[in-house]
């Protein structure tokens, strides 16, 4: 599971600035989907080969007319509880204020590893600033400038060194890892029961990392699977009895840990903004996607047509994903999900050599050439596999920075069709080859 770092502090201390600085590297790989409201409170970053999930709690608190919003019973409380460690940000220019002390008192009760970072500090006053905030009780503060990044690397190096070790909970032969993602009350727990089946074989059910995620291995038709329970579904006395609680953090962790995501829609409620935001996150994670539209049996013909039209209209950015119209309660259509899981997983495991990808690139260019830039055609030379999770194909060429996003989407679709990637979002990463003559004086 991705380690979670929560950025906490009172308003206007620079939480979003630090969040944006740490996550800016993702912008080159993942573009916003048109028409989808981007959720800016959660972001992924990679530091020294360690992938992290960052949570900017500043976007989660209603601070209107309040100096310090209450932490209790808010998403901030949930984010803090589900994090592995906390970056507590304060403002050097404002100095230590009562709001900082109130937050510090609450954080001390959490039992988490907390790093105190003093933002907006001049180098000349670093020692003075550190002594002012030392009384908060989190050890020596780290002096940073989030806007420029000064001091941030040293801070994050210490964060990485203090992350709790993840426990090994999955044995070797557990098969395909499946995550169930969806809004609250769309039928996730019912579908999980249906997937596990009446004659299920539960190998084990034990806590995973410090965030208490749970892996549930099971077998069906001699095939092994593992259900990743990180969306807040917890067993009670009986396995049939589940309690559901939505968590964006655990949903994001599930996406990144899974081989295949089943995204569940409620046919009676249609496509909501929250559905679109979750789908956007799944595309970013690059995991294989299957869309299951639940409670289908309760709709008449006209209502079904309306739902299909709404999906076509509002979800064109996931048109690569297979759709299944099901009833988790009665089991209608659920059997097809297992075939889709197998096919989707196998398609992403196929061999992808540089030669194969380059030949596909050449055919794509021959069928639809890149546009002209200042009268010259953008040249794409070769392609190779950058990563499988997310599936990233790196395309090398000249002047690739000028390639429009529409052409990158064309290439992604072409690769998907050529290699029959089933339900897999394809990310295109463009690289411009160095110009050997750049920087030389004209003669």
UniProtKB/Swiss-Prot annotation:
Q: Does the keyword Nucleotide-binding apply?
A: yes
Q: Which family does it belong to?
A: Belongs to the TRAFAC class TrmE-Era-EngA-EngB-Septin-like GTPase superfamily. EngA (Der) GTPase family.
Question: Self-association or partners: how does it assemble?
Answer: Associates with the 50S ribosomal subunit.
GO:BP terms for this protein?
A: ribosome biogenesis
What phylogenetic lineage does the species belong to? Bacteria, Pseudomonadati, Pseudomonadota, Gammaproteobacteria, Legionellales
Does Nucleotide-binding count among this protein's keywords? yes
Record-listed GTP 2 binding positions: 182-189, 229-233, 294-297
Highest taxon listed in the record's lineage? Bacteria
Instruction: Outline the extent of the KH-like domain.
Output: 350-434
PANTHER family found in the cross-reference section: GTPASE DER
Where GTP 1 is bound, by residue?
9-16, 56-60, 119-122
UniProt keywords (A-Z) are: GTP-binding, Nucleotide-binding, Repeat, Ribosome biogenesis
**InterPro entries per the record?**
G_ENGA, GTP-bd, GTPase_Der, KH_dom-like, KH_dom-like_a/b, P-loop_NTPase, Small_GTP-bd
Under Gene Ontology molecular function, one entry of this record is: GTP binding
**Domain annotation EngA-type G: ranges:** 3-167, 176-349
- What is this protein called in UniProt? GTPase Der
Q: Function, please?
A: GTPase that plays an essential role in the late steps of ribosome biogenesis.
One family name in Pfam for this protein: KH_dom-like
């Amino acid at each position: 599971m991705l380690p979670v770092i929560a950025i906490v502090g009172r308003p206007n201390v620079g939480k979003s600035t630090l969040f944006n600085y740490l996550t800016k590297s993702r912008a080159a790989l993942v573009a916003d989907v048109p028409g989808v409201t981007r959720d800016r409170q959660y972001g992924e970053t990679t530091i020294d080969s360690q992938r992290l999930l960052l949570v900017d709690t500043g976007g989660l608190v209603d601070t209107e007319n309040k100096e310090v919003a209450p932490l209790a019973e808010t998403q901030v409380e949930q984010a803090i509880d589900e994090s592995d460690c906390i970056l507590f940000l304060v403002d050097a220019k404002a100095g230590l204020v009562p709001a900082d002390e109130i937050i510090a008192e609450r954080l001390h009760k959490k039992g988490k590893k907390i790093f105190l970072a003093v933002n907006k500090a001049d180098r000349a006053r670093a020692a003075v600033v550190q002594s002012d905030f030392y009384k908060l009780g989190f050890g020596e503060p780290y002096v940073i400038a989030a806007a420029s990044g000064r001091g941030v690397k040293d801070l994050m190096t210490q964060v990485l060194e203090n992350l709790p070790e993840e426990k090994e909970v999955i044995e070797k032969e557990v098969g395909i890892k499946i995550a169930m993602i969806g809004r609250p009350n769309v039928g996730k727990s019912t579908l999980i029961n249906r997937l596990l089946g009446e004659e299920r074989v539960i190998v084990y059910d034990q806590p995973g990392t410090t965030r208490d995620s749970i892996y549930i291995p099971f077998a069906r038709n001699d095939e092994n699977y593992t259900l990743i329970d990180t969306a807040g579904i917890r067993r009670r006395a009986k396995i049939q009895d589940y309690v559901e609680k939505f968590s964006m953090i655990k949903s994001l962790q599930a996406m990144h840990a899974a081989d295949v995501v089943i995204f569940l829609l409620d046919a009676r409620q249609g496509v909501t903004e929250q559905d679109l935001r979750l789908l956007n996150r799944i595309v970013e994670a690059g995991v294989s996607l299957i869309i299951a539209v639940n409670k289908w049996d309760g709709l008449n013909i006209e209502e079904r047509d309306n739902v299909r039209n709404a999906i076509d209209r509002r979800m064109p950015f996931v048109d690569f994903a297979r759709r299944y119209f099901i009833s988790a309660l009665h089991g209608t259509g659920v059997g097809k999900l297992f075939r889709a899981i197998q096919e989707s997983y196998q398609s992403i495991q196929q061999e992808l050599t540089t030669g194969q990808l380059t030949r596909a690139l050449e055919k794509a260019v021959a069928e639809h050439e890149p546009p002209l830039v200042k009268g010259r055609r953008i040249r794409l030379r070769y392609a190779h596999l950058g990563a499988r999770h997310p599936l990233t194909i790196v395309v090398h060429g000249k002047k690739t920075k000028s390639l429009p996003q529409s052409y990158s989407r064309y290439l992604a679709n072409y690769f998907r069709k050529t290699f029959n990637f089933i339900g897999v979002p394809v990310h295109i990463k463009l690289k411009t080859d160095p110009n050997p003559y750049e920087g030389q004086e004209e003669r």
